[in-house]
Swiss-Prot record:
Name of this protein: Large ribosomal subunit protein uL1m
Subunit composition and interactions: Component of the mitochondrial large ribosomal subunit (mt-LSU). Mature N.crassa 74S mitochondrial ribosomes consist of a small (37S) and a large (54S) subunit. The 37S small subunit contains a 16S ribosomal RNA (16S mt-rRNA) and 32 different proteins. The 54S large subunit contains a 23S rRNA (23S mt-rRNA) and 42 different proteins.
Assigned protein family: Belongs to the universal ribosomal protein uL1 family.
Subcellular localization, as worded in the UniProt entry: Mitochondrion
PANTHER family: 54S RIBOSOMAL PROTEIN L1, MITOCHONDRIAL, LARGE RIBOSOMAL SUBUNIT PROTEIN UL1M
Length: 303
């Protein structure tokens, strides 16, 4: 029979020995596919994966403004175009509706633009209101008022411009006030309205009387995006009046084009006539109506 000390020693050895782990039951792999499946990654050459993006394709840059082939396009004589446009404007006040010509040019995008003034045989605008930038309290200010300027001066005129008050649709600047105009910093307000005086447009002058005489009855035009637009008549104009205005306008544009450098090609591609509320009618350089029953005199009466 074992003694008491031997029993205690054997118990001590059992308490100090490493406990054995319970054996995990064996689980079939098909019951745990996420554990059993091995995760394998492969390198890829696809640039779209991993957040990479393809570089956008560069758009083709064209040197010339877009043009269209007029072969087969329906075009109208002046009287036919007036006939259809007058029908669209039935019920509109004759004095509020204008005929407008759009001259499409074949021209480079980065080339010089056509910009000038022309005096039409039959004026379209009769509400020319001119303001003059000139020294305050000077004889020039008095001269401008006597010539019919709606406003004249320097700081008073600049303050009206900054406040958005534009009681004029033409603006001149005398050469003595050219420095004051630059310091006033009003170009951002006048430029978008086409009112900023400049030597190129002959609106900076030292002869107010001659400039007033030239501006009254003259209309300005400017090429924008390869097109020159200008009002050439009121709805009450006769076909002959409208034809003469268009003839003078086109002759002036061709003269301006002829003055440009030969290295900057520019030519008239299409002429379109429209009205305030009407569509654009491509003209074919003919005058008479195609309908024998219609005469130009029939388009002279008030609608």
């Amino acid at each position: 029979m074992a003694s008491t000390q031997q029993c205690l020693a054997s118990l001590a050895r059992l308490s100090l020995s490493t406990p054995t782990r319970a054996a995990l039951p064996t689980i079939p792999k098909f019951l745990v596919p996420s554990v059993a499946a091995s995760q394998v990654r492969y390198a890829t050459n696809n640039p779209n994966k991993g957040g990479a993006k393809k570089a956008p394709k560069k758009k083709k840059q064209y040197k010339f403004f877009k043009s269209w082939d007029l072969t087969g396009q329906q075009q109208f004589s002046l009287c036919d175009a007036m006939r259809y446009l007058r029908a669209v404007e039935v019920g509109q006040p004759p004095l509020s509706v204008k005929y407008e010509v759009h001259v499409k040019l074949r021209t480079k995008k980065n080339g010089p633009v056509v910009r000038d003034r022309v005096r039409l045989p039959t004026p379209v605008k009769t509400d020319t209101r001119i303001a003059v930038i000139c020294p305050e309290g000077s004889a020039l200010q008095e001269e401008a008022k006597n010539l019919g300027a709606v406003m004249a001066g320097e700081e008073t005129l600049f303050e009206a411009i900054r406040s958005g008050n534009f009681p004029f649709n033409k603006l001149l600047c005398h050469t003595e006030s050219e420095g004051a105009l630059r310091k006033a910093n009003v170009g951002k307000l006048l430029g978008p309205k086409g009112l900023m005086p400049s030597g190129k447009t002959k609106t900076i002058t030292n002869n107010l009387e001659a400039t007033f005489r030239d501006m009254i009855g003259m209309d300005e035009y400017r090429e924008r995006n390869g097109v020159v637009r200008m009002a050439v008549g009121q709805l009450g104009f006769t076909p002959k009046q409208l034809a003469e205005n268009i003839r003078v306008f086109m002759a002036k544009i061709k003269s301006d084009i002829g003055k440009l450098d030969d290295t900057t090609p520019k030519m008239v591609e299409e002429v379109v006539l429209s009205t305030t509320h009407g569509p654009g009618m491509s003209l074919n350089a003919e005058f008479a109506p195609t309908d024998d029953k219609i005469k130009p005199e029939d388009l002279e009466s008030v609608m």
